[in-house]
Regions:
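Conserved catalytic segment of ABC-fold P-loop ATPases
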Residues: 132-135, 148-150
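Short cysteine-rich clusters marking metal-coordination/redox-active sites
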Residues: 165, 177-180
Length: 213
């Protein structure tokens, strides 16, 4: 394990029952809890919380300040940007048509989860899709296509049922966040914050919208 450190933050820490393989990189302040496994080649940013019984595969990239709750497996090809929340037992895949007796490692498809996104408990993210920044995937949803930034997704298969603010609040018809007062507007390419009273979170760029379009 390579554990980055800084003068004002504690070094990364792993519970004695966790296994962090040599060649995995953990950022300063990151904590890995009981019975979790971080494979060689995984890169985890600073100040992350990795819950119990989490499996992080080789080549997985996790940004800073992410929270991975219990019983989550992240496979090769998964990238989580900064501030992503993965709820308990949410599921990622990396092959669309797996067979036990056929090697399909060459067919792994990547999954990218954008800045600040939330994935609810027991949700499934089918590989090859991108989740936009600050989106919210409801518990138990099954995501089978790209998700726009700030979208609220629910159901099987998941569909957009509304919008959420950067603070994670469901937006009503007025598109005003009830927690922060931030105001949003629908544009042809998605939702945009037009009044930022809270100062929380980065606004969505045209490039971010296009990347999941």
């Amino acid at each position: 394990m390579s554990a980055a450190s800084s003068p004002d933050r504690p070094p990364a820490w792993a519970h004695p029952s966790a296994e962090v393989e040599p060649g995995a990189v953990l950022g300063a302040g990151t904590r890995v809890w009981r019975f979790s496994h971080v494979a060689a080649g995984a890169l985890i940013g600073g100040d992350c919380v990795i819950g119990q019984n989490v499996a992080i595969g080789p080549g997985v990239i996790i940004g800073a300040r992410c929270k991975i709750q219990n019983n989550v497996s992240l496979y090769a090809g998964v990238v989580l940007e900064d501030g992503v929340f993965c709820g308990p037992s949410c599921v990622f895949t990396n092959v669309t048509t797996p067979r036990a007796e056929i090697d399909r490692k060459a067919e792994f498809r990547p999954t990218r989860v954008g800045r600040g996104a939330t994935i609810g408990a027991n949700a499934t993210i089918v590989c090859g899709n991108a989740l936009g920044a600050w989106c919210l995937i409801a518990a138990g949803a099954v995501v089978t296509h790209d998700v726009p930034p700030l979208a609220l997704m629910a159901g099987v298969p998941a569909r957009r049922v509304g919008w959420v603010s950067h603070a994670g609040e469901v937006l009503g018809a007025d598109l005003v966040c009830p927690r922060t007062g931030d105001r949003y507007a629908e544009r042809p390419d998605g939702l945009r914050r037009v009044i930022n009273l809270s100062g929380f979170g980065e606004d969505i760029s045209e490039e971010q919208s296009a990347s999941v379009g």
